[in-house]
Amino acid sequence: MSNEENQQKVVVSLEDLLAQADALKKYIDYLQKTYAELQDNIMSIDSSLQALKELQNSQELLMVGDKRGNVIFKVQGIDKAKVLVHLGLEYYAEVDPDFATKVLNDKKSELSNVLSNVEKELAKSLEAYKEIADILNQAQQQLQAQQNKGG
């Protein structure tokens, strides 16, 4: 067999490539949004873990009223023996801080694994998008060259 026989050529229309690029762009946008949400969740868990550490070391705790810190409460007289930890969905459990730390660390580990997978998928999708964009750019350059020769 000659080298030419080993190479397979695939013919794809420009319309199909454009449709693929559009679908891939939407998928990339979805992955980027998911990535940002996962990072935000991990940062929230880190904040909760830090709050649990502070709880054990202080008489007074500052509690942020919202994500942006528009209002902060000074809280005293907290029962340091029990905290409520989110288990998932709408379920919370009253547990000791050490168990809450374990739950949060497990959650963080799971989210970090998902984040890693999303990051890999995002990299593959961006590479595929770049390849399609390169093909489309080459096709556009060839078309312009043909128009310049003819016109």
Swiss-Prot record:
Subcellular location: Cytoplasm
Recorded GO MF terms: unfolded protein binding
One GO location term (cellular component): cytoplasm
SUPFAM superfamilies, alphabetized: Prefoldin
Signal peptide positions on this chain: none
GO biological process, one term: protein folding
Keywords of the record: Chaperone, Cytoplasm
Subcellular location, principal: cytoplasm
Gene3D superfamilies, A to Z: 1.10.287.370
InterPro entries: PFD_alpha_archaea, Prefoldin, Prefoldin_subunit_alpha
Subunit structure: Heterohexamer of two alpha and four beta subunits.
Function of the protein: Molecular chaperone capable of stabilizing a range of proteins. Seems to fulfill an ATP-independent, HSP70-like function in archaeal de novo protein folding.
HAMAP family hit by this protein: PfdA
Protein family (similarity comment): Belongs to the prefoldin subunit alpha family.
Record-given protein name: Prefoldin subunit alpha
Organism of provenance: Sulfurisphaera tokodaii (strain DSM 16993 / JCM 10545 / NBRC 100140 / 7) (Sulfolobus tokodaii)
Lineage per the UniProt record: Archaea, Thermoproteota, Thermoprotei, Sulfolobales, Sulfolobaceae
Encoding gene per record: pfdA
